[in-house]
């Protein structure tokens, strides 16, 4: 699960996470609304440390990156190259402030040349992206040209980078999903806005855990992904979620519908997923260590809650 810093900031307390999760900086919303980051690097690092300590199981955290969509550039009044430099500088600053926290570098750009330039900026500052467990690819979630994104992703993969694509489209994952480590999506929440709630407490399904898991299954089946067996559980999907879409108002025992942005805790989590890709899956060893250290064939599809 990918949770936004904007949803967690200011909360007095948090539940403990029952499984690994990742933190999104909420940068697109922050820059779109305010044209700048109102939180400095030190304050953000302090917040991330609190999440890692109090929630636990933090797999990785995005830096205070600067997106490069046209609407964001218009709002900040800065150039694309300035956004790239600030993204790199912020990662370096966070790494110096909190070397023990799992911040990942993020590449920003519009064209393929832009992304190569951003990668070169990291390299010139001594960051060997090819040795890192994960590198984010930003500013792709609103792209309508899937072939263009595919060219960017494949070119970055050719440089030896293990990629997480922020908000990649499902049509895109059909084409280049075999080259990335992970991706995330809020499509389940957007589509759920137009579905009546499954219980009296739900006006719609936009924040419903059962609806999210049902969407998750449909997408992974469409992408021809097969479940990866969770080494800590005998089931990859809670039994109460197997019967179908969230139309019966039945949620897993002990769990309640997850609200967008809530910390990933208490409810049983679905197992991780890896692709079958129309050929027999390779032999796997039990998953150990941090989630993004696993074999590239074991890629999750992450539900974004932000």
Where are these regions (language model features)?
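Generic structural signal of hydrophobic/aromatic residues within well-ordered alpha-helices
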Residues: 44, 48, 115-119, 215, ...
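Short, acidic/turn-prone active-site loops that include or flank metal/cofactor-
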Residues: 7, 26-29, 139-141, 186-194
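Alpha/beta catalytic cores of nucleotide-metabolism and tRNA/nucleoside-modifying enzymes
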Residues: 49, 96, 124, 151-163, ...
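Low-complexity, flexible helical/coil segments
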Residues: 15-16, 33-42, 56-63, 95-99, ...
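Eukaryote-skewed repeat-based solenoidal scaffolds used as protein-protein interaction platforms
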Residues: 49-183
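Non-catalytic, usually N-terminal nucleic-acid engagement modules in DNA/RNA processing proteins
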Residues: 1-89, 241-242, 246-271, 275, ...
């Amino acid at each position: 699960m990918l949770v936004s810093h904007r949803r967690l900031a200011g909360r007095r307390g948090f539940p403990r996470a029952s499984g690994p999760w990742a933190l999104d900086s909420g940068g697109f919303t922050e820059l779109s609304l305010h044209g700048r980051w109102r939180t400095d690097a030190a304050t953000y690092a302090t917040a991330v440390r609190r999440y890692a300590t109090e929630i636990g199981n933090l797999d990785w955290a995005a830096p205070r990156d600067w997106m490069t969509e046209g609407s964001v550039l218009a709002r900040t009044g800065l150039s694309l190259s300035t956004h790239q430099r600030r993204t790199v500088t912020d990662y370096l600053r966070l790494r110096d402030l909190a070397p023990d926290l799992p911040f990942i570098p993020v590449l920003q750009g519009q064209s393929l040349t832009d992304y190569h330039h951003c990668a070169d900026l990291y390299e010139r500052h001594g960051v060997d992206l090819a040795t890192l467990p994960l590198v984010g690819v930003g500013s792709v979630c609103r792209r309508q040209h899937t072939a263009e994104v595919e060219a960017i992703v494949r070119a970055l993969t050719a440089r030896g980078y293990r990629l997480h694509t922020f908000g990649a489209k499902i049509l895109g994952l059909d084409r280049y999903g075999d080259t990335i480590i992970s991706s995330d999506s809020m499509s389940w929440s957007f589509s759920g806005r137009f579905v009546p709630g499954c219980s009296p407490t739900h006006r719609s399904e936009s924040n419903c855990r059962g609806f999210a898991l049902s969407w998750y299954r449909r997408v992974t089946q469409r992408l021809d992904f097969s479940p990866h067996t969770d080494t800590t559980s005998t089931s990859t999907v809670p039994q109460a979620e197997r019967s179908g879409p969230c139309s019966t108002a039945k949620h897993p025992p002990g769990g309640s519908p997850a609200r967008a942005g809530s910390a990933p805790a208490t409810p049983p989590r679905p197992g991780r997923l890896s692709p079958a890709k129309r050929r027999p899956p390779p032999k796997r060893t039990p998953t150990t260590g941090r989630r993004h250290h696993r074999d590239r064939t074991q890629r999750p599809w992450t539900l974004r809650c932000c």
